[in-house]
Amino acid sequence: MKYLLILLFLFSNHSFAEESLNKYTINANGNVEIIEEHKYSNTHSFKNYTITGTFEDNLGNYGSHSIAVIAEYKEDNVINLQWSSKLIYQNNKVIFAQGVRKKGIDEAGVGKAILFSGEKPLNVLNNTECNYAIKFIKNNVFTKWLCNISEKNLNILKNIN
């Protein structure tokens, strides 16, 4: 019975901690520029490209971003894709993100990202893991990031200028 109570306590605390997290979203758009492409065969290729554009979060913050991407494709599917992003907020403060995508089609997919090396006050986002979805139309890209952050950090981000 004692162990059951301990387990119940741990699970209730875990649930409470999850409930105290808030959704932080970033919508980003940009243009793709292919730097280098290697066609290994008709169905296998490598691309190195950049994406530059703008973003806005669900708190009204906004800015510009630049992304460097390396990707390998086989039969129009992503085999491996890695990227690094620099986000510059309206207050000229910078935070970086890196992400990966291991599967999906060339035109769309989902992956994981982590935010890091943020300048104050963006440093409250350091080590925040996010899920992202991306889709392409010609040379245009649309992304949505979904992150969970604490109420305290959400309030800090509401007040950046």
How does the language model describe each region?
Residues 18-161:
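Beta-strand-enriched cores of mature, soluble protein domains
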